[in-house]
């Protein structure tokens, strides 16, 4: 049995899905600006707005989704763009997860992710609704940072997920369908 229903069976007709993923030009950026490209954030926001325009989608009907590093981008872009967000165990800057062996790409991000998310609550509209983050205090190495963001932005809904197949952060993405 799978903890999540398959999204294709659960969405309404005329629904368009853009999943935040950390690939291509943005590899390793978590959807954030890097030292090599300071336009990633603006490009993503413009891409979302462009698709909304092409498909005549109202802002209140947009949900930004992602897991892990894609969840980082989903939370960030959902908050700065004022979109609904559904993020699963996003990385918000806890380098302890890497045990002192930070991947090189984390050093290419223009501003450290932890700093970005500490400043973010002072830079956005706090009246946002439908900001949902799924994590687990039992298994997620990222949970303390997620809890800090929730403290700074109380409108974020933090869903504490408990499923026997999820024993560590890496298990979230493998047990997620969206």
Descriptions of predicted regions:
Residues 21, 65, 88-89:
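Alpha/beta-hydrolase-fold catalytic nucleophile elbow
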Residues 66-78:
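Glycine-rich nucleophile elbow surrounding the catalytic serine of serine-hydrolase chemistry
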Residues 79-86:
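Conserved hydrolase catalytic core segment
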Residues 1-27:
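Short, surface-exposed "cap/lid" segments of acyl-processing enzymes
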Residues 33-55:
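Alpha/beta-hydrolase active-site loop
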Residues 87-97:
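Active-site nucleophile loop of the alpha/beta-hydrolase fold
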């Amino acid at each position: 049995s799978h903890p999540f229903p398959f999204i294709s069976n659960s969405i309404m007709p005329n629904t368009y899905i853009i999943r935040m993923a950390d690939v291509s030009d943005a590899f390793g950026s978590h959807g954030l600006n890097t030292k090599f490209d300071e336009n990633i954030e603006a490009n993503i926001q413009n891409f979302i707005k462009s698709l909304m325009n092409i498909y005549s989608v109202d802002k209140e009907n947009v949900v930004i989704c992602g897991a892990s590093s894609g969840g980082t981008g989903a939370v960030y872009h959902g908050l700065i763009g004022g979109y609904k967000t559904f993020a699963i165990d996003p990385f918000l800057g806890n380098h302890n997860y890497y045990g002192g062996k930070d991947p090189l790409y984390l050093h290419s991000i223009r501003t450290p992710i932890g700093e970005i998310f500490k400043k973010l609550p002072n830079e956005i509209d706090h009246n946002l609704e439908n900001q949902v983050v799924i994590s687990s205090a039992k298994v997620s190495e990222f949970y303390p940072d997620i809890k800090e963001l929730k403290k700074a932005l109380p409108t974020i809904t933090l869903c504490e997920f408990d499923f026997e197949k999820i024993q560590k952060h890496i298990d979230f993405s493998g047990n997620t369908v969206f």
